[in-house]
């Protein structure tokens, strides 16, 4: 019988161990304790971070939102029907990231950045964190460049600047989305990249928005992030942050971007749903205590950053350029109640609001902008010179008209001055009306405002103000194209432009019909 040498045995074992090809991974692993309504409770994940991605079997991911003493509450990103009690859950050591870059322009993606438009994969894109800290005070620059929405009522009375947060607020079906979409359409030649985030909307509505942007040639410089009503609350909650990260890509590289959140009321509802399922204590209107922070940390990321910030971020690749991300958040009110919890929160966070009123909309004044309640806190410094010069009396005329119209209902006879003021107010109200998907250029807008400001509408019938304006703009674009081009390029207002407009309108009124 052959004798085995103990040293040989150890050599054989050692050789086998050396040849064994095993890649070991040190991972924090836990067990799923319960699964319900998209919320998973996990036991045993001791080292998990807040907001960390958690991997489940079958390539399903979750996000840790509740870190408790003996368990972790996570929200599942996507379908949770394949998960069951007893399954393993692993920490990934990563926080949620989404694709960013110019490859996303013209595409429709979900809240995680996956394309959903059937146009194939995105290609090689960078990724960036969904949750980021807003630029500090030192890196910011004041707002002094305009974002033209193409609406007279907005650009004349409630101007929006690059890097501003301007809230669009009003009841349902009143033209909030229409205003935001027109603002995006108006950017197709302005060099501003756009991001449209649809939260909790019908898929047919999102498809309609995509079609309209495509028809108007604005889809090529727009990213659409869609978290429709059929998506889980987790994705509806994350969509605005994902869209913001995509917009910040342009801001941080010295470009200008515009982001529309449509709408943040539905994001707050989705977050409330998640919080209640995670058993967090409810507060006012059953919203969790941090619902203000939900919106403030999102909207603070919209800003205008300095040349130094862009240079530092790009490691000197881009110099001498400021970047901006302008936000147009939308909030839906119930029966015009702006004092509800979420509307008051967002009003206090933003730099002004455009208030759309049901009564005006129903009486045919569209866009239904209530100039009295609407305000732009920083946009005045960014307004185009010619619009600023000519729009001074418009807001006053409308405010006085509304005040006098209320008194005129009770007065039997009015003096001449009051009657003139009322008629001027009616004409200005007519002039502020504008068709959907027809944003105006600076020159067209300036011409309309000039006609109102300098009294050229006084002898025009109130019912014919709209047709007068259309005919006047068509006449100037045909016979005074050079003057209009000059206004569009420079946006200045001087004696030559004043004289040119005056002479042109006088000739138009003498020779043309409308």
UniProtKB/Swiss-Prot annotation:
CDD domains associated with the record: ATP-synt_F1_alpha_C, ATP-synt_F1_alpha_N, F1-ATPase_alpha_CD
Keywords: ATP synthesis, ATP-binding, Cell inner membrane, Cell membrane, CF(1), Hydrogen ion transport, Ion transport, Membrane, Nucleotide-binding, Translocase, Transport
Site (Required for activity): 374
Pfam families linked to this entry: ATP-synt_ab, ATP-synt_ab_C, ATP-synt_ab_N
GO terms, molecular function: ADP binding; ATP binding; proton-transporting ATP synthase activity, rotational mechanism
GO cellular component: plasma membrane; proton-transporting ATP synthase complex
Annotated residues for binding of ATP: 170-177
Chief location of this protein within or outside the cell: membrane
Gene3D superfamilies for the chain: 2.40.30.20, ATP synthase alpha/beta chain, C-terminal domain (1.20.150.20), P-loop containing nucleotide triphosphate hydrolases (3.40.50.300)
Catalysed reactions listed for this entry: ATP + H2O + 4 H(+)(in) = ADP + phosphate + 5 H(+)(out)
SUPFAM superfamilies according to UniProt: C-terminal domain of alpha and beta subunits of F1 ATP synthase, N-terminal domain of alpha and beta subunits of F1 ATP synthase, P-loop containing nucleoside triphosphate hydrolases
Oligomer status and interactors: F-type ATPases have 2 components, CF(1) - the catalytic core - and CF(0) - the membrane proton channel. CF(1) has five subunits: alpha(3), beta(3), gamma(1), delta(1), epsilon(1). CF(0) has three main subunits: a(1), b(2) and c(9-12). The alpha and beta chains form an alternating ring which encloses part of the gamma chain. CF(1) is attached to CF(0) by a central stalk formed by the gamma and epsilon chains, while a peripheral stalk is formed by the delta and b chains.
Listed name of the protein: ATP synthase subunit alpha
Organism listed in the record: Pseudomonas fluorescens (strain SBW25)
Gene symbol of the encoding locus: atpA
